[in-house]
């Protein structure tokens, strides 16, 4: 059973009851997932940007957007319009497929993994987690990478509070650390 199907059939009715909501449309849901990678060295090294674009496209299965500097900062040696990172926004089927792979395959492959921090919510029910290396994803092979780079993964939900967002992600299988 896919994560989307499990959400519709079991998670949604359970959250409706647990959060004591009156309408099925009030139940929080995942709206989008943003995978972002900032590359400080991309200003000097164009190959690192190309490698990052290829890796993120392989991991997410979607075209990558290059993020550019909004203004020049002399201290960082960047000019306006220079590429400084890349990002992917996932919605729909690809979003659910990525979330399922993240929860079931990627996170358990992290060394000394005890669960993700429950404190990484933003106050509006959205969750952000930082990944230190791209090797936790089974799509990336060790032989094809030139450097170990991390990424930020933001899960945007329709939840109004952090508690609603956490209960949604916990039902979906996100392994939260118990503090």
Swiss-Prot record:
The keyword Ribosomal protein applies. GO terms for cellular component: ribonucleoprotein complex; ribosome. NCBIfam families: PRK00010.1 (NF000585). Keywords: Ribonucleoprotein, Ribosomal protein, RNA-binding, rRNA-binding, tRNA-binding. It comes from Prochlorococcus marinus (strain MIT 9303). InterPro entries: Ribosomal_uL5 (IPR002132), Ribosomal_uL5_bac-type (IPR020930), Ribosomal_uL5_C (IPR031309), Ribosomal_uL5_CS (IPR020929), Ribosomal_uL5_dom_sf (IPR022803), Ribosomal_uL5_N (IPR031310). The keyword RNA-binding applies. Belongs to the universal ribosomal protein uL5 family. This is one of the proteins that bind and probably mediate the attachment of the 5S RNA into the large ribosomal subunit, where it forms part of the central protuberance. In the 70S ribosome it contacts protein S13 of the 30S subunit (bridge B1b), connecting the 2 subunits; this bridge is implicated in subunit movement. Contacts the P site tRNA; the 5S rRNA and some of its associated proteins might help stabilize positioning of ribosome-bound tRNAs. GO terms for molecular function: rRNA binding; structural constituent of ribosome; tRNA binding. It holds the Pfam family Ribosomal_L5. Part of the 50S ribosomal subunit; part of the 5S rRNA/L5/L18/L25 subcomplex. Contacts the 5S rRNA and the P site tRNA. Forms a bridge to the 30S subunit in the 70S ribosome. One of its GO terms (biological process) is translation. This is Large ribosomal subunit protein uL5.
